[in-house]
Design a protein with these regions (language model features):
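Conserved alpha-helical scaffold segments that buttress catalytic/binding sites
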Residues: 1-192
Length: 192
């Protein structure tokens, strides 16, 4: 879901997806900005790309009636979802690569929301990762050169996404530490 956040390019850093970062930091951020005279509920929004995302994707991806759709709060769930569903390839639409941010050393530690995709490659659970950055990301593929050289990773635009097989599963992550709670109704409209 943070693929669509029009404020992502202003944020650097990392947020572990836990209760504190999902809920409390939004209240803190809201009141800090309000004291400065800024209403972040007006400036922090989703981009217009959300309106035609599914139409563009359906041109190149075959969704069947039995395609599973899973909703979670954390990208960490994607790791288990990929393993449980025995997928060979993952297409990730996100403002972050989730490959791990310490090069190959990222995989020496437990799986988390920032390295789940890289960990799947490292452990041989998937053969290919396809990353479709959101239009507001501040990341770029060269930041992951060491990982890119070690594994089969493609960086695509939304229009370049193609699937030869019907899509078995869709995982949609709200990612609450990146997605402002006042956008929840828009999230529901996107999903349903």
């Amino acid at each position: 879901w943070d693929y669509f956040m029009n404020y992502m390019n202003h944020w650097n850093g990392s947020y572990i997806e836990n209760d504190n970062n999902i809920n409390k930091h939004w209240y803190k951020k809201y009141y800090e900005e309000k004291r400065r005279g800024i209403d972040i509920t007006k400036s922090m929004n989703v981009g217009d790309e959300v309106d035609n995302f599914w139409q563009i994707l359906k041109k190149n991806v075959d969704f069947k009636k039995d395609t599973k759709v899973l909703l979670t709060e954390s990208h960490l769930a994607a790791y288990k979802i990929a393993i449980d569903n025995k997928v060979d390839s993952v297409i990730s639409f996100d403002s972050h690569s989730d490959l791990g941010y310490q090069g190959l050393d990222s995989f020496k530690f437990e799986v988390n929301c920032a390295d789940w995709l890289g960990k799947l490659l490292y452990e041989g659970k998937i053969k290919e990762a396809n990353i479709v950055y959101g239009p507001y990301t501040n990341e770029y593929s060269d930041q992951f050169k060491e990982i890119n050289e070690a594994y089969n990773i493609n960086y695509l635009s939304l229009e370049e996404v193609k699937c030869e097989e019907p899509c078995k599963i869709i995982h949609i992550c709200r990612s609450g530490c990146w997605s402002a709670p006042w956008l929840d109704n828009k999230f529901k409209a996107f999903v349903f």
